[in-house]
């Protein structure tokens, strides 16, 4: 018998983009069944919606001006249960000391905080910064299970022109079995092909649908950015349908504290997508299953047997 059964739930099925009515059986921290179940403890949801915990696949926590525990307090009530952060802002100022600070202050939180290592400190060789992080310095961090890969590769032209310092960072990342995030605004044609061939899996810099479609057709995951500074969702609304939505995810990139308080986090992006015409189940999928698949989270991102009981309950999609 299950430890807990959530009765009469309307489940957002991110595999079929449907809303299913069923019970959810949970034992320990795992979902063990979806259907008709009884358990030691039962909670009647009376038709409320159950979604997987929301994932922000690209954010700089520093832009919130909050340390780890305070950031958790800001986003967890909005249904965010995991974030993937690139600490390049603090690393450009404080180097490894800043990176270590971010890793340490996000340990043992209810919010799962994963990291992509800052790839460009400084952003280019023309930049000046408070630190320089080379491949040798970053290499030991790939042994940390919370480190998922190499963050946005901002020096796109250095990558295309085979800068040995950049290629070594990519090589270290891929040899560790991790992934590489992209940052290549308006890169196109042969340069884009070369950039992706270097091993860059995703991009969050698309500002128009033509750019997004070119990158999508070449195999990249597209991160649809809607945060405090950059707002690209409206221009990219054609991606909120199959076959595109299964490889596109919602991210914030930067979210200032006032915006977190006033409008929320990824939940705000879902609501906006729905207002702009997206199917609610599709919008939820793009903030759950797709980022989970991109980053290799095997037990996150869906309400299904074998997945973590990492769930949120909402009355409606509008509020």
Give a label for each model feature.
Residues 48-72:
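Di-metal (Zn2+ and/or Mg2+/Mn2+) metal-binding site signature of metallo-dependent hydrolases
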Residues 53-61, 83-85, 113-117, 149-152, ...:
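Hydrophobic faces of well-ordered beta-strands that scaffold small-molecule active sites
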Residues 80, 146-147, 194-202, 217-223, ...:
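Glycine-enriched alpha-helix->loop->beta-strand junction motifs that scaffold or abut catalytic
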């Amino acid at each position: 018998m299950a430890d807990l059964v959530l009765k009469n739930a309307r489940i957002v099925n991110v595999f079929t983009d449907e809303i299913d009515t069923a019970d959810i059986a949970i034992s320990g921290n795992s979902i063990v069944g979806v259907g008709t179940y009884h358990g030691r403890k039962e909670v009647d949801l009376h038709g409320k919606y159950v979604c997987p915990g929301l994932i922000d696949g690209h954010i700089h926590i520093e832009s919130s001006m909050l340390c780890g525990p305070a950031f958790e307090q800001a986003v967890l009530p909005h249904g965010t249960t995991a974030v993937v952060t690139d600490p390049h802002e603090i690393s450009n100022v404080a180097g490894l000391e800043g990176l270590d600070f971010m890793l340490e202050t996000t340990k043992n939180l209810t919010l799962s905080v994963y990291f992509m290592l800052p790839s460009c400190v400084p952003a280019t060789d023309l930049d000046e910064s408070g630190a320089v992080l080379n491949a040798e310095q970053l290499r030991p961090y790939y042994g940390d299970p919370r480190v998922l890969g190499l963050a946005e590769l901002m020096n796109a032209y250095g990558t295309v022109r085979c800068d040995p310092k950049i290629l070594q960072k990519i090589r270290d990342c891929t040899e560790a079995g991790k992934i590489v995030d992209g940052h290549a605004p308006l890169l196109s044609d042969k340069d884009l092909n070369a950039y992706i061939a270097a091993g860059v899996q995703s991009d969050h810099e698309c500002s128009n649908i033509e750019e997004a479609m070119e990158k999508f057709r070449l195999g990249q995951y597209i991160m649809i950015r809607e945060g405090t500074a950059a707002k690209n969702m409206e221009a990219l609304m054609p991606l909120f349908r199959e076959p595109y939505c299964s490889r596109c995810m919602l991210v914030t990139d930067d979210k200032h504290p006032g915006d977190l308080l006033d409008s929320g986090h990824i939940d705000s992006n879902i609501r906006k997508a729905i207002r702009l015409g997206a199917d609610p189940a599709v919008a939820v999928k793009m903030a759950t299953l797709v980022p989970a698949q991109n980053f290799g989270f095997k037990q996150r991102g869906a309400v299904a047997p074998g997945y973590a009981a990492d769930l949120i309950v909402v009355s409606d999609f509008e509020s």
